Structure formats: C-alpha cells, structure tokens
C-alpha cells in the first residue's frame, strides 16, 4: 500500500469516527429531547422542501435520522467526497456512462462545441430531486436553443433496503446495471426532455463528481464553470438558471462614436 492510499484510509478512519460520534450524539438527543430534535430536523427539511413535500408526512422520514441505515449512508457520502475530482475551473471528468439502450458512452460525448452542458445527478428515491424536477424541466425548455442537458442516474439515495423513507418510491439498491437502467426509465414518465443515462455499477461518475445523493454541474468546452453544492440541502436548479443566463447571453454591442 502506497503512501497516498494509506493517507486515504486514514482520512476514511477519521470520517468514520466523526460520523459515528454524530450519530451517537444525535440518537441520545433524540431520546432525551425528541420534540426539539424533531423541530431541528424539520427546520433543515424546509431548506430542501422536504418539510413542504405533500408526499411525505414528518413521521415518514424524521424518525429515520440517526438509525444504522442513516449512519451507513452518511458515511458513504462523506467517503465519496474524498474521491471528488471535479474542481471549479478544471477539466470535467470524462466518465463512462450508459445509455438506457445499454450503449456505453462518455460524458464529453454530450458536449456540443461551446454550448454549456448541464449535468443533473440524482435518483428517483431522492425526494428533493423529484420535488424540483419540474424546475429542472423549465431550465431545459427555457435554454434548449443555447445549452444542453444530461441527467445521470446514480445509486439510490433512499432505497427500500437502505436508508428508506415511508411512502417513498419503492426501489431497492441496484444489484446490476439492468436494475439501474430499469430505475432510470421511471424518469421517462416525467418527460425529462433531455437524455437520461446511468452511472456504471462502479459508481465512477458519482464518485469523481461527488454527486451522491444529488448535484448539479455546468460544463463549457470541457471545463467546470459551475459546481453546485451537494444535495439535498443545497440542490438548487435556480442557481443553474443564473449561470446559464450569464453564459448564454451574447455580449451587448457598444456602438463606436
């Protein structure tokens, strides 16, 4: 094991201990002060829209916090961020993705000249991803003539055999590429109006873009010109609108005197 790999595992160990401590403290506080902890979680849910999501009552999701499934999911997300290679201003990782037809391609295959390419990472079991899907579709409609869009379906955020929410979409963790493609096809019923591809079963794009559970990027000419903060708390399609308005608006011509 080389020094970089050893350093990575040391970072993972530190994160493991941090998450374990956070979950243990959260569990104790939820036992001692259930009302206060619930209000705190609901306040966080206001930011994602979860607390206003008509599909979910608080009892569908609040009690799942600080469970063993919560621990493993948060740990996975934190560990994945150590693999982040998508830097603002840097070259976008040209990861392999798979079309719903089964054909393999690369993210850069969807770049067309100098047109911005919006990457939308998410899954059907991520409530905020679906709640804000119409916002994303409006982006596609409004900028169809000047930008391109790509949905990359990644591993499930709240699979039924993972950190599950009651009354959520019923999809288990993907055990094969076929299962991932089948889950991604559910998005077609929502008329995404842009290509949908899936991440590989090695979760390459999800790791290199630190995309779990959901995230937005804008690429132009192979470079990252917008890196949205990680969801669900900071997943915001309207930020992408502001970026596209700046990138796609031609400079005003100032007449010479």
Curated annotation (Swiss-Prot):
Protein family: Belongs to the iodothyronine deiodinase family.
Subunit structure of this chain's protein: Predominantly monomer. Can form homodimers but homodimerization is not essential for enzyme activity.
Protein name: Type I iodothyronine deiodinase
Residue stretches spanning the membrane: 13-33
Extracellular topology ranges: 1-12
Subcellular location(s) of the protein: Cell membrane; Endoplasmic reticulum membrane; Basolateral cell membrane
Job of this protein: Plays a crucial role in the metabolism of thyroid hormones (TH) and has specific roles in TH activation and inactivation by deiodination. Catalyzes the deiodination of L-thyroxine (T4) to 3,5,3'-triiodothyronine (T3) and 3,3',5'-triiodothyronine (rT3) to 3,3'-diiodothyronine (3,3'-T2) via outer-ring deiodination (ORD). Catalyzes the deiodination of T4 to rT3, 3,5-diiodothyronine (3,5-T2) to 3-monoiodothyronine (3-T1), T3 to 3,3'-T2 and 3,3'-T2 to 3-T1 via inner-ring deiodination (IRD). Catalyzes the deiodiantion of 3',5'-diiodothyronine (3',5'-T2) to 3'-monoiodothyronine (3'-T1) via ORD.
GO biological process: hormone biosynthetic process; thyroid hormone catabolic process
Topological domain ranges for the Cytoplasmic compartment: 34-257
GO molecular function, one term: thyroxine 5'-deiodinase activity
A GO term from the CC aspect: basolateral plasma membrane
Documented EC number(s): 1.21.99.3, 1.21.99.4
Main location: membrane
Alphabetized PROSITE patterns for the sequence: T4_DEIODINASE
Keyword set, alphabetical order: Cell membrane, Endoplasmic reticulum, Membrane, Oxidoreductase, Selenocysteine, Thyroid hormones biosynthesis, Transmembrane, Transmembrane helix
Active site feature: 126
